[in-house]
Amino acid sequence: MCIRDSPVPAPDTGPDAGAVWHYGDPLGEQRAAETEALVIDRSHRGVLTLTGADRQTWLHSISTQYVSDLPEGASTQNLSLDGQGRVEDHWIQTELAGTTYLDTEPWRAGPLLDYLRKMVFWSDVTPAAADLAVLSLLGPKLAERAVLDALGVDALPAEAAAVPTRGGFLRRMPAGPAGRLELDLVVPRAEAADWRNRLAQAGVRPGGVWAYEAHRVASRRPRLGMDTDERTIPHEVGWIGGPGQGAVHLDKGCYRGQETVARVHNLGRPPRMLVLLHLDGSADRPATGDPVQAGGRAVGRLGTVVDHVDLGPIALALLKRGLPADTALATGPQAAVAAVIDPDSLPAAEQIGAGRLAVERLRGGAG
């Protein structure tokens, strides 16, 4: 399969600087991700490794996920919080062949590595940068025999699991609301081009990160630093859940920021919620970080903005919790861009946490 056009680089000022934005047909690439098979070079992501006998129990003690005995081949999300429970780092974690792999945003790999090294103390663990590239694959045809042969596997791994490949591993991501097939191929950086060529020969079309971002936003998956800000706590963006389901396990021991996690869980009311917005495409495009307004008052913050092949201009946004789905919203320069909440993206009806239930019983507010 030949590349249709020369690669168009991602904007230098954006989070994917240095990556390919698209190959001349961005909407066609998105369609291929839904109906065929697409490979996206995300090698600008940072990859770290942890080795040593204490790596799992040590990381368990300083992060939010339950990973002290993460099984061979398992993969999960994980976080590092500050003392107030606000998100500092998010990564995808994979356990394979005596090594724990962490991949994270390009601009956070260095700070995360510095933090991990500072926390080693007397533990038998060595954090290091890894010269590995992440290639993401989308589409239903990834399960076809020709693609499996190109990947060097007999069958795809289970969701939230990984299998070794030549010099790296193949990881299957959770399907999400749309149930779409998504894989990550993590391989030596020097071999990434060879892997892309092999996949192209198997019928997998090359695509840019625009296609990946459209898929991610439509799936309502937040991205650190784009859909989060300096105040974000895990409950606001759907990161609560055990291995393979979320990034924060609610039944584990002490870690930095745990008090906030427990308090918000017990009270049951995080201050904000992550939603999908549909934007008016006739106005100037808004930008990440723009305020979202209702009735002239700020009610939230705009996250990733992207044009989707089926949904048109969409964005993720952190909005004041409890805002009705039919609220008229505006964002962008001079609040000139109309926006509406996708009702399917609203959080499930809130359950009253144990702490709040006790308070309301004392006040006579609950039976």
Label each PLM-derived region with a short phrase:
Residues 4, 231, 237-248, 256-258, ...:
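Glycine-rich, small/acidic residue-mixed loop/short-helix segments
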Residues 4-76, 81, 86-88, 367:
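Acidic, proline/glycine-enriched N-terminal capping motif
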Residues 26-35, 76-90, 120-121, 162-173, ...:
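Short amphipathic beta-strand starts and helix->beta connectors
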Residues 38-39, 47, 89-223:
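Acidic, low-complexity central loop/insert segments
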Residues 50-55, 137-143, 278-287:
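Short, surface-exposed ligand-recognition loops at beta-strand->loop->(often short) alpha-helix junctions
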Residues 66-67, 117-125, 199-210, 294-299, ...:
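A common structural junction motif
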Residues 72-74, 154-165, 220, 225, ...:
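Glycine-centered loop/turn motifs
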Residues 186-278:
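Anionic-ligand-binding alpha/beta catalytic cores of soluble enzymes and soluble regulatory domains
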